[in-house]
Amino acid sequence: MLSGLANPRQAAVQLMNFGLILSTAFMMWKGISVITDSPSPIVVVLSGSMEPAFQRGDLLFLWNRNVLAETSVGEIVVYNVKGKDIPIVHRIVRKFGKGPEAKLLTKGDNNVSDDTELYASGQDYLVRNDIIGSVFAYIPFVGYVTILLSEHPWLKTVMLGLMGLVVVLQRE
């Protein structure tokens, strides 16, 4: 069963194939990031704050190419809050001013109040630079795997172990 490991050349080929898969995935991610002009072109909805528009586990595709274009009320955006790692998906409900320095107020469709409590300390509004991208497409529930992996860390270990086992046992 592990006879493939006895041959160093075959083991090296398997290791290189695994590295090729990882580097291809990374290059695809970076390519999509450049095309969409977004550091995170694909995000997963982590909470129910945007229901019924988006459910927990929906996979969202972002577009940020029109940085100079006006952001409009009603647009669903993903933004980062200074000091927090997790991006937030919410709708723009109010806009004050025009251009890149316009002040934007967001709110989740399923939330009672706006997002001022979520913003960084001393921040009352968002500006265009806080926005990672606007949602232009989504796939329902596909991102639920990400949620399961973050809520159950042992699943990561099991999946990585299975992937490693497949690479080791793979025959050319």
Swiss-Prot record:
Listed CDD domains: S26_SPase_I
EC number: 3.4.21.89
Class of this enzyme: hydrolase
Residue ranges annotated as Lumenal topological domain: 36-172
Residue stretches spanning the membrane: 15-35
Region (C-terminal short (CTS) helix): 158-169
Catalytic activity: Cleavage of hydrophobic, N-terminal signal or leader sequences from secreted and periplasmic proteins
Compartment(s): Endoplasmic reticulum membrane
Sugar-bearing residue positions: 111
Function in brief: Catalytic component of the signal peptidase complex (SPC) which catalyzes the cleavage of N-terminal signal sequences from nascent proteins as they are translocated into the lumen of the endoplasmic reticulum. Specifically cleaves N-terminal signal peptides that contain a hydrophobic alpha-helix (h-region) shorter than 18-20 amino acids.
Domain-related comment: The C-terminal short (CTS) helix is essential for catalytic activity. It may be accommodated as a transmembrane helix in the thinned membrane environment of the complex, similarly to the signal peptide in the complex substrates.
Protein name in the entry: Signal peptidase complex catalytic subunit sec11
Taxonomic lineage: Eukaryota, Fungi, Dikarya, Ascomycota, Pezizomycotina
Gene name linked to the record: sec11
